[in-house]
Amino acid sequence: MKTIRAQMAVLGFLLPLVLSAAAGPDFGQTVRNFSANRHKLIQELAARLNLPLPPEAEAFFQAALAGDWTAVSNQLAQMQAQDPCQARQPALMNELWAPIHETWGLYEVWAGLKEDSELMAKFTEPILDSMPAGSIYFGGTDAGRFAVTAVNDLQTPPPAFCLTQNGLADNTYMAYLREIYGKRIWLPAPEDSNAAFKQYVDDVKEGRIPTGADVEIEDG
């Protein structure tokens, strides 16, 4: 009986370890690590570009580092415009907004997937594993953008250049990409980007809308 009890005790001790190993990495820690990564990045950008970092931004990142979802949401509400992709504060209408937006976006994806680490791994790993090092990755959906960017950028060195096509008409986002990627990839100059966007707008106004495009015109 003593031998059986001893074996059961050992099994009871080992079973949680086996289950823990099978569960894989905790993506919640990835969220916090990415928050630290973007906190460092926004501080570097502020120093390099001589831009003041508002206290609300610092409070946002402190909440993110602590993994406090409610505080993260409350702090973001003080900085975010009606358009969730844009800043409300003039001090953040520049390269500093993207690290905040990317951090918040990852938190939203993580919460939306019910904090399921296994599901996050099944989503992100095949995408990154399918690309050779040095690839340029365009993330269109929130999960495709924020989750993949986080997993990619926490690797040393990051294997891919992650960006979103949804932000390419935004001059502040393009300026952000130029700062973080520099001359490692080609990016259009501001005047070229603006000219391309103007051409697209002109085409839409003339009725030359690409097949399958979803275009809405507001206020003329």
Task: Kindly label every feature range from the protein language model.
Residues M1-L11:
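Bacterial N-terminal signal peptides that target proteins for export
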